[in-house]
Amino acid sequence: MESLETLARHVSPRGEVLLRRRIDEGHCIEELIINGVFAMDSSETSTESMLAELALPNEHAQRVLVGGLGLGYTVAAVSAQNVDAIDVVEIEECLIDWSHRGVTATLKAAADPRTRLYAGDIREVFGDASHGPVGPWDAIILDVDNGPDFLVFEENSDLYTDAGLRAAYARLTPGGTLAIWCQCPVPALSAALQRIAPSAEEHIIEVVRGQRSFGYAIYTLSRPRDSIGRARQE
């Protein structure tokens, strides 16, 4: 029998942020719901680890930018890599507060001394250097939505336009990688990344949840090491 427990709740200008725990067949599962949209849960988090690995293919990275704190799994996966500094931008300030309070074990990952949490909109980081941390970064990880077809906030659609993707790409160091998590393959996103640089790749990850199989997708785009890596001009 399944039971639900609310761990934390906050209403922001963008809607309700709900963190809850459910017991399902003896398993404790934490889930995050934002603005009425199911953002994620803790039942299967292997793709967060894969996201960090694909974004950080090299042995060492000085700086990494993570867009979206969520339940902290992506940040924890990045922390497990050889990284000097991790900048995390989260639009819902309550999630940062819950992280400092250690409401869940994975949110405590943000207490890593290498990690700095910024309350703000990741779009502004790419659009205006006066907001939040300033690049460039060796890796940029976007884990703010379930992909461009399943947005938590409609305004996030700007991130996945040609202009938005180019803005993120421009803030990578030479050899740096942009990685984007999606709950399913998005051909339009793949095409948009290919228009920027030939290094764009689609990684399909098959995950079994219960009796169902899902094909999640991670998209990566890397800047050349031996040049300034300018985006292709149309």
Feature locations, PLM:
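A structure-centric signal for secondary-structure junctions around beta-strands
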Residues: 14, 27-29, 61, 136, ...
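The AdoMet/dcAdoMet-binding core of the Class I SAM-like
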Residues: 45-172, 180-181, 191, 205-209
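Rossmann-like AdoMet
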Residues: 1-57, 80
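Short coil/turn motifs at beta-sheet boundaries
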Residues: 25, 110, 212-214
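Glycine-centered, small-residue-biased loops immediately flanking beta-strands
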Residues: 176
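Generic beta-structure capping elements
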Residues: 22, 35, 142-145, 224
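Class I S-adenosyl-L-methionine
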Residues: 183-234
